[in-house]
UniProtKB/Swiss-Prot annotation:
Native source organism of the sequence: Homo sapiens (Human)
InterPro entries: ATPase_P-typ_cation-transptr_C (IPR006068), ATPase_P-typ_cation-transptr_N (IPR004014), ATPase_P-typ_cyto_dom_N (IPR023299), ATPase_P-typ_P_site (IPR018303), ATPase_P-typ_TM_dom_sf (IPR023298), ATPase_P-typ_transduc_dom_A_sf (IPR008250), HAD-like_sf (IPR036412), HAD_sf (IPR023214)
Tissue: Found in most tissues. Most abundant in thymus, trachea, salivary gland, spleen, bone marrow, lymph node, peripheral leukocytes, pancreas and colon. Also detected in fetal tissues. Expressed in cell lineages of hematopoietic, epithelial, or embryonic origin and also expressed in several cancer cell lines.
Gene name of this polypeptide: ATP2A3
Name of the molecule in the record: Sarcoplasmic/endoplasmic reticulum calcium ATPase 3
Region (Interaction with phospholamban 1): 370-400
Protein residues bound to Ca(2+) 2: 304-305, 307, 309, 796, 800
Catalytic activities: Ca(2+)(in) + ATP + H2O = Ca(2+)(out) + ADP + phosphate + H(+)
Positions in the Lumenal compartment: 70-89, 274-295, 778-787, 852-897, 950-964
Length: 999
């Protein structure tokens, strides 16, 4: 049943043809079950393991590698001679890479499905219903409850379905619905109709929602929605409908894969076609088919060379290292790709409660009456420091600290705060923090009493556990609480009846202490406490007191105010009818006003500076809260989201104001707004959608079940460590300390990771370009193979992989949070940078071919043939006069490939040292600024010597040890790459940067 909150309870019962006393008949239950189904959230139909495995092979790069592996297997099968064993190494290594990637991918997918399943923890096992087939209340499985059932709930119960309240069987009914609405305090419910068709869930005070908890009271309601039709079920449907977006990095790598696949296809076909004339050369036994297969192998080698096989592993390692650094800053990342996405965040949509504020209600102001006569009323005003539940703080009047025990009014105010209170402070020894036990508002009063210490209790020798309630305990030893008149909506107050624990010198007897909404309490006051005496409360005094409270409640502070009062001569408790809550207001009359406290959920001290950093970094901060607009705007001003006098028109909206806008106006509002108040979960999702339509990268925080769809939809969903399992499962990141400052630290880390990632991706790609140029040149010029596929795999995965990973440890730029967020569409490599790394790659390719050629032509241990003979080596035979006196087996020597491989590895190590900074010279940013890079380079060179010297590795990699003279030549060919890159960096700093600035 939709909009049950609009109708009187009797009309809702009539709709279901049921009575509150009799309940549904068995026939009605059967009909409803057939119509609505069971009262449970269906399990998510996850993908099968096979489907998940197949998904991992949808990536274009992976498919190219898979094809290369399959072709290599086929070619290896037909190999002859000593290469039979080594031929299988290459396809096996590629397959191992693909299997490892698939395992990681499947594991991550399995984790992602837990968000929807986590919703089930909010479904109760059992429910209490009234049905006509049995007298009284019966317990049934919650899944068997149907719309129309009469359901009973009491304190401690989890609500089993969405209920329209029809009767409250206690003084009050309070419900913790924070998982659904995000409200930090429990909500008082009632049974009257709410004639507002656009009421948000927070305003539906006559409804109980499935999965929420009863914190006090007892009530009966009629089930109006079950299963997927409940508010919890709607959230489940929203989450199931959200398709996870690919991160900017994933999209860039997809695009890179497409471009690379096209380039590989063109180059491979070109190499094969260009060499058609050589298919029938004598080296192939005169067989055209064998020649075609030989050049097909070269084309496959080219594909292997062009694909940076180590890139997925290096990116994963870099992101994993980033997550460890973030975890040390209290940001726990659940999804690796989102680490990089943080770096291009342009909007942070943050909850107010607990993230921007401490979520620890704190009294920051109070007043008692100093003087009162017929014409005026003077107040003693005090400020209190401290923003958490830690019972430490200073009470000041003006600029001067005061001893509260010197003010009789403050002694009585502290007494009321301590006794008219059902909550307490507790020290959590495991966490090392003070925590509330009970309601946030009352805990703030308990904490205030500890700060005031009106009886000058010696607190020095106390442990923290004892300190939590020391001053409150002293007051409670003087007065004994007899009973409590609970809060009710009509009188907006609560009170306690107390008697002295020992005879008072003045003969003082029982008292009633009252706290509540100022207008309601002051209306029932006839006098006011001035020090230790009582004075009449005149209309002038009443108005001055209310004016001060209005000022506190509506100014820049928007404090939540509570009035405190005493009834000095209450009726005897035997004469009071405590079963009839309608009489409570009669007992809370003829009151004496004592004072007023103003409290707020204080902003976290470090947040204002973090918001300033966000603005410097070009990131817009938007507060989203369920609180009213006035409070939200006031907190925004305190935090610097709005200026002190800034006009907030068009920059702050309530959920209802937002709904009143046209779709296009809503889009524009999301582009300019910095505050949304009184919003529902659906608003959050719409805000994210609108921001995404402007290509904004949005980080969205949340902690409740209601936040899960928006967390899943946003590029970066951020859940609170204290939040629900559903929110954490739907989010990419969890803040263990619930602190906004941790988000900003994570964004900074994300930017640093992206900067480093660009360095190692370009480093790896320049290596691949060099390998492609090398193979392409040897094929075009008709030279012997300089590098074979298994060597290329070794370089791409191992020798290049270690320095590339170490580049992830590069120190971040000092101005990293002073730059605008980069566009998610910004290419990894484009324009000038593409030319730079193409130039380096071409040098790498030329150098490797030159090294192999040098051995054939110039090396003392080589055959000393000329370049023309080398180009025509495939025509070598005993009958060919061109090769007279030359052993044709020399073209199978391992020396030229070893020379080429050694030059490739050495140049790549030089490239790695050059990559500490994108544009800074090695003289300004030397390699030792990243010690891990030096270690990685040393390890890569050690591994290179390992394959040269330790059997059976030389056989597998087709290499052989080099002489000292040959190593000198390797260094002579390799080291100039440093000078080339320094020249390109110089141009980049002094010319390209100026051109980009002018643009």
């Amino acid at each position: 049943m939709e909009a049950a909150h609009l109708l009187p309870a009797a009309d809702v019962l009539r709709h279901f043809s049921v009575t509150a006393e009799g309940g549904l008949s068995p026939a009605q239950v059967t009909g409803a079950r057939e119509r609505y189904g069971p009262n449970e959230l269906p399990s998510e139909e996850g993908k099968s393991l096979w489907e998940l495995v197949l998904e991992q092979f949808e990536d274009l790069l992976v498919r190219i590698l898979l094809l290369a592996a399959l072709v290599s297997f086929v070619l290896a099968w037909f190999e002859e001679g000593e290469e039979t064993t080594t031929a299988f190494v290459e396809p096996l290594v590629i397959m191992l890479i693909l299997v490892a990637n698939a395992i990681v991918g499947v594991w991550q997918e399995r984790n992602a499905e837990s968000a929807i399943e986590a919703l089930k923890e909010y479904e109760p096992e059992m429910g209490k219903v009234i049905r006509s087939d049995r007298k009284g209340v019966q317990r049934i499985r919650a899944r068997d409850i149907v719309p129309g059932d009469i359901v009973e709930v009491a304190v401690g119960d989890k609500v089993p379905a969405d209920l329209r309240l029809i009767e409250i069987k206690s003084t009050t009914l309070r419900v913790d619905q924070s998982i659904l609405t995000g409200e930090s305090v429990s909500v008082t419910k009632h049974t009257e109709a709410i004639p507002d068709p656009r009421a948000v869930n927070q305003d539906k005070k006559n409804m109980l929602f499935s999965g929420t908890n009863i914190t006090s009271g007892k009530a009966v309601g009629v089930a109006v929605a079950t299963g997927l039709h409940t508010e919890l079920g709607k959230i489940r449907s929203q989450m199931a409908a959200v398709e996870p977006e690919r991160t900017p990095l994933q999209r860039k790598l997809d695009e890179f894969g497409r471009q690379l696949s096209h380039a590989i296809s063109v180059i491979c076909v070109a190499v094969w076609v260009i060499n058609i004339g050589h298919f029938a050369d004598p080296a192939h036994g005169g067989s055209w088919l064998r020649g075609a297969v030989y050049y097909f192998k070269i084309a496959v080698a080219l594909a292997v060379a062009a694909i940076p096989e180590g890139l997925p592993a290096v990116i994963t390692t870099c992101l994993a290292l980033g997550t460890r650094r973030m975890a040390r800053k209290n940001a726990i990342v659940r999804s690796l790709p989102s680490v990089e996405t943080l770096g291009c965040t342009s909007v942070i949509c943050s909850d107010k409660t607990g993230t921007l504020t401490t979520n620890q209600m704190s009294v920051c102001r109070m007043f008692v009456v100093a003087e009162a006569d017929a014409g005026s009323c003077l107040l003693h005003e005090f400020t209190i420091s401290g923003t958490t539940y830690t019972p430490e703080g200073e009470v000041r009047q003006g600029d001067q600290p005061v001893r509260c025990g010197q003010f009789d009014g403050l002694v009585e105010l502290a007494t009321i705060c301590a006794l008219c209170n059902d909550s307490a402070l507790d020290y959590n020894e495991a966490k090392g923090v003070y925590e509330k036990v009970g309601e946030a508002t009352e805990t703030a009063l308990t904490c205030l009493v500890e700060k005031m210490n009106v009886f000058d209790t010696d607190l020095q020798a106390l442990s923290r556990v004892e300190r939590a309630g020391a001053c409150n305990t002293v007051i409670k030893q003087l007065m004994r609480k007899e009973f409590t008149l609970e809060f009710s909506r009509d009188r907006k107050s609560m009170s306690v009846y107390c008697t002295p624990t020992r005879p008072h010198p003045t003969g003082q007897g029982s008292k009633m202490f009252v706290k509540g909404a100022p207008e309601s309490v002051i209306e029932r006051c006839s006098s006011v406490r001035v020090g230790s005496r009582t004075a009449p409360l005149t209309p002038t005094s009443r108005e001055q007191i209310l004016a001060k409270i209005r000022d506190w409640g509506s100014g820049s502070d928007t404090l939540r105010c509570l009035a405190l009062a005493t009834r000095d001569a209450p009726p005897r408790k035997e004469d009071m009818e405590l079963d009839d809550c309608s009489k409570f207001v009669q007992y809370e009359t003829d009151l004496t006003f004592v004072g007023c406290v103003g409290m707020l959920d204080p902003p976290r001290p470090e947040v204002a500076a973090c918001i300033t950093r966000c603005y410097q970094a070009g990131i817009r901060v938007v507060m989203i809260t369920g609180d009213n607009k006035g409070t939200a705007v006031a907190i925004c001003r305190r935090l610097g989201i709005f200026g002190d006098t800034e006009d907030v028109a068009g920059k702050a909206y309530t959920g209802r104001e937002f709904d009143d806008l046209s779709p296009e106006q809503q889009r524009q509002a999301c582009r300019t707004a910095r505050c949304f108040a009184r919003v529902e979960p659906a608003h959050k999702s719409r805000i994210v959608e609108n921001l995404q339509s402007f290509n904004e990268i949005t980080a969205m925080t949340g902690d409740g079940v209601n936040d899960a769809p928006a967390l899943k939809k946003a590029e970066i969903g951020i859940a609170m460590g204290s939040g629900t399992a559903v929110a954490k499962s739907a989010a990419e990141m969890v803040l263990s300390d619930d602190n906004f400052a941790s988000i900003v630290a994570a964004v900074e880390e994300g930017r640093a990771i992206y900067s480093n990632m660009k360095q190692f991706i370009r480093y790896l790609i320049s290596s691949n370009v060099g390998e492609v140029v090398c193979i392409f040149l040897t094929a075009i010029l008709g030279l012997p193979e300089a590098l074979i596929p298994v060597q290329l795999l070794w370089v791409n995965l191992v020798t290049d992989g270690l320095p590339a990973t170490a580049l992830g440890f590069n120190p971040p730029d000092l101005d990293i949070m002073e730059k605008l967020p980069r566009s998610p569409r910004e290419a990894l490599i484009s324009g000038w940078l593409f030319f730079r790394y193409l130039a380096i790659g071409v040098y790498v390719g030329l150098a490797t071919v030159a090294a192999a050629t040098w051995w054939f032509v110039y090396d003392a241990e080589g055959p000393h043939i000329n370049f023309y003979q080398l180009r025509n080596f495939l025509k070598c035979s005993e009958d060919n006069p061109l090769f007279a006196g030359i052993d044709c087996e020399v073209f199978e020597s391992r020396f030229p490939t070893t020379m080429a491989l050694s030059v490739l590895v050495t140049i790549e190590m030089c490239n790695a040292l050059n990559s500490v900074s994108e544009n800074q010279s090695l003289l300004r940013m030397p390699p030792w600024m990243n010690p891990w890079l030096l270690v990685a380079v040393a390890m890569s060179m050690a591994l290179h010597f390992l394959i040269l010297l330790v059997p059976p590795l030389p056989l597998i990699f087709q290499v052989t040890p080099l002489s000292g003279r040959q190593w000198v030549v390797v260094l002579q060919i390799s080291l100039p790459v440093i000078l080339l890159d320094e020249a390109l960096k110089y141009l980049s700093r002094n010319h390209m940067h100026e051109e980009m600035s002018q643009k």
